[in-house]
Regions:
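Conserved donor NDP-sugar-binding/catalytic core segment of glycosyltransferases
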Residues: 64-97
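Short, flexible, basic/aromatic active-site loop/helix in glycosyltransferases
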Residues: 93-125
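Catalytic beta-strand/loop signature of glycosyltransferases that borders the donor
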Residues: 131-133, 157-168
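The conserved acidic donor/metal-binding loop of glycosyltransferases
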Residues: 56-60
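Acidic donor-binding segment of Leloir-type glycosyltransferases
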Residues: 1-30, 71
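Glycine-rich, basic loop-to-helix element that forms the pyrophosphate-binding segment
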Residues: 30-47
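Acidic donor-binding loop at a coil-to-helix junction in glycosyltransferase catalytic cores
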Residues: 136-148
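Short aromatic/hydrophobic "clamp" motif used to bind/position activated sugar donors
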Residues: 52
Length: 169
């Protein structure tokens, strides 16, 4: 990790730990609650920066990812949400690869997962958006929380763009 981070770990016992790694502030919350949507909402509520990146525990970020995200938001100042590429390791999981910058709309929003998504936190909070607690790993329905989140962003009128920048493997 080469940025400040909030890590939500779904395990017992409940614990909050904060530490520095290099010059970055890492906040680590362990809680027994289950559900990826709940974890993402918990992190979103505790975030202090305006630009936030959602992640999964199996990603390995490439050097300079923080600067790439900040630059992308500067390149798309009207964007509320940006979606990036994640490269599949050993082609075990095929992921849609963004080839050129484009606006995400109703006809193409369903192909992107939350782990490749960065947001302007103020836009999300102003529109009272959050991840569904019924969908996603650990919830009643085991997938779809990321698609519902992007759906809700579009419904709220947020501007979403896809950019051909790879952040992680």
């Amino acid at each position: 990790v080469q940025s400040d981070a909030i890590v939500i770990n779904q395990c017992e016992p409940f614990a909050w730990r904060e530490f520095k790694r290099d010059s970055y502030r890492i906040r680590f919350l362990s809680c027994g609650e289950r559900g990826v949507g709940l974890s993402r909402n918990t992190a979103l509520m505790r975030a202090e920066r305006d630009i936030c990146l959602f992640s999964d525990d199996d990603l390995i970020y490439r050097d300079g990812y923080e600067e790439k995200i900040i630059q992308a938001f500067e390149d798309f100042p009207e964007a509320d949400v940006l979606v990036f590429n994640i490269q599949s390791i050993d082609n075990k999981k095929s992921r849609y690869q963004i080839q050129k910058p484009m606006r995400i709309r109703w006809f193409n929003f369903a192909r992107y997962g939350a782990a490749r998504t960065a947001i302007r936190r103020t836009s999300i909070l102003q529109h009272h958006l959050s991840f569904s607690l019924l969908f996603g790993g650990g919830a009643q329905y085991s997938c779809g929380e990321d698609t519902l989140f992007l759906h809700d962003c579009l419904k709220a009128g947020l501007r979403i763009y896809a950019v051909p920048i790879t952040l992680a493997d």
